[in-house]
Amino acid sequence: MSSFIGKLKNSSNNTEIFEKVTPVHEIKLGEIVDLLNAFKDSRENLLLPNMNDAFTKKLYSTYLSYLPTDKFSYPLKMNVDERGSFTEFIKTQERGQVSINISKPGITKGNHWHHTKNEKFLVVKGNGVIRFRKTDSTEIIEYFVSGEKLEVVDIPVGYTHNIENLGDSDMVTVMWVNEIFDAERPDTYYLRV
């Protein structure tokens, strides 16, 4: 914009200014409407748009900049029980989903394994232990984790795993999984570590 204004100020004849706008994105109006509706729906279904597409990325940024200031925030569905809570945060078709897990003191969650899901756990508050056991082995592997020392623990397929809160307060874990949860095909199999 400042380049355009500069040309207006420096031109002796303002009617002869011609500038080419780049980049040019070719897209149908109906596709733009679909994108705008998807942006609106993303606050409920948590699906982020494909940021690899330059036009989608720019349109999403523009969409957010036009939200009323009282609409910058939106609630998430917390699945709460006596053990703590599990809340889905972000989903993408290309890169899986991110969730927030809160575990009460002394609670162990998990004791399951996956065929195709791999996960990354990051404890950001509290202290705990993540345990693994290959499904065809008796050897148990332990990683002690803490919000005081941020480190990612990969959860590979074929390992039953759990996470236990060893602290006196809630433990908060950011969890990434490589695919969006599908209730019809959960790929989650109970097996104690």
Where are the regions a protein language model picked out?
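Double-stranded beta-helix
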Residues: 137-139, 166-193
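A short beta-loop-beta micro-motif enriched in histidine and acidic residues
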Residues: 95, 107-120, 147-149
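Structural signal for conserved beta-strand scaffold positions within catalytic alpha/beta enzyme cores
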Residues: 19-21, 75, 88, 100, ...
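Glycine- and acidic-residue-biased ligand/ion/polar-headgroup-sensing regions
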Residues: 116-135
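Mid/C-terminal beta-alpha module of Rossmann-like enzyme folds, strongest
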Residues: 1-76
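Short beta-strand His + acidic residue motifs that chelate non-heme Fe in jelly-roll/DSBH
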Residues: 86, 110-112, 130-132, 152-155, ...
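Short acidic-glycine-tyrosine-enriched beta hairpin
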Residues: 134-158, 164, 172
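A short glycine-rich, His/Asp/Glu-containing loop-to-beta-strand
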Residues: 72-111
